[in-house]
Amino acid sequence: MALKTILNYSPNFNGKKRIYKQIKFIIFHYTGMKNESNALKRLTDIQSEVSCHYFIKNNGEIIKMVPDLYIAWHAGESSWKNHKSLNQNSIGIEITNPGHEHGYKKFTQKQITSLLRLSKFLIKEYKISPKNILGHSDIAVLRKRDPGEKFPWEYLSKNKIGIWHTLNKKELKKNRKIKVSMREEDFFFNNLFKIGYSKKISKNVSKERYLNYLIEAFQRRYRQNLIDGKVDQECLLISQNLVKKFH
């Protein structure tokens, strides 16, 4: 399958090549900057020490910034299951969007069409499992909110790009804001750790604060129309359904 890209290489990557089988993950990001040109400047500035493999513009054009077999600097401090520092074994895709700090907005249809095409190409090329297609906030719960609650995870999952639950929406919504017991809340967090979210709490952050961020990261991906940082029966049911899919 031919993939049409524009070349605009970033100097920010590790010099040592990796091998095909090291590439196990795709990580989605939004740029989180006021405009597209600023984002491109930052990703190609040697002093910024950040980059990605692919950049998707508002008009759907795909820019290749780092060759796949080199490690781009997009994930930062990160964790998923038993993997740390996911730069080593992932492909990073940045999608132009101002993000939560600059007027977060819906991704364009052209962006999503290109993302679909690019993801399918990478999945086939590197035999990447749907379970290993993640958002930046999945792997860096305390630091990141991207790609955020406007990112079309459910739509992408229908094309085997990422995982989504298989619960009936109407039935599920009836459980929204219904409180859980302490035991059920513990069960919810255990489900998240089984899915892959990190158990490790930074020394600088209280357990309560970390768990609140963790709930929000989960909601931004799987319960996108209400991010309140609270566990309810709806969240619990979704987590139970997902555990089966991630194992």
Regions inferred by a protein language model and the residue ranges of each:
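Active-site-adjacent loop/helix surface patches within enzyme catalytic domains
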Residues: 2-131
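A glycine-rich, coil/turn loop motif that links secondary-structure elements
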Residues: 202-212, 228-235
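Basic/polar, cationic surfaces and motifs that engage anionic cell-wall
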Residues: 99, 104-201, 213, 217-223
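Extracellular LysM carbohydrate-binding repeats and other cell-envelope/extracellular binding modules
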Residues: 224-247
